[in-house]
Amino acid sequence: MKTIIYIFLLIPFISLSQGISVNVSQDARLALVGDERGNKAFTTNVNVGAEFRGLQKGSSYFLMRPELEYADLKGGELYRMTANFGYTFNKWIKDVDFTVTLGGGMLSRYELGGLHTQANLQTTWYFTKGIGLFLDSEFVQRIDLPNKFVGYSGKIGIKIILR
């Protein structure tokens, strides 16, 4: 039932958007070396998002990007749902996009539930038509982090433009 509700909520965005892409990323540090909290290399921390693009205005366009994150961290799994809004600047350098977003949402970890906020800076390089690699710098405020003010993660991922 939840899936049907989500589909009906997304239909207006799908029909009004000027383009849709799918993003899949992994936290680079957790994938390669682990972290100081005891998570080893190859720790799963996957983000999946859908990007709905607005009309192109000059060198940029507005976007909305809902995301889901799952991380199998030491001490407990993390689930996050986020709604991001921002701008992509795609006319400065050929085949390169620069995206700035702000967002917020809900998370669940250690039997804790709560809100989080985040800011992202993303650079995408399109190596072929409709497929690109991106680096995403994320600054996030989460209740489950020891430093509850701001945490940082660097993600690497792939973006596929569907239309």
Describe each model-derived feature in a short phrase.
Residues 4, 21-25, 64-66, 82, ...:
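Intrinsically disordered, low-complexity peptide-like regions
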Residues 3-14:
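Sec-dependent N-terminal signal peptides
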Residues 2, 24, 98-100, 123:
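Intrinsically disordered/low-complexity terminal segments and short unstructured peptides
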Residues 47-117, 125-127, 160-163:
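Gram-negative (and chloroplast) outer-membrane scaffold detector with strong preference
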Residues 40-42, 77-79, 115, 150-152:
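Short beta-strand micro-motifs in enzyme catalytic cores
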Residues 16-63, 68, 155-163:
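Short glycine/proline- and aromatic-enriched beta-strand/turn motifs that initiate or cap beta-hairpins
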Residues 29-31, 96-109, 134-141:
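Hydrophobic transmembrane alpha-helix bundles
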Residues 22, 32-38, 68-70, 119-163:
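Predominantly the C-terminal beta-signal and adjacent terminal strand-loop region
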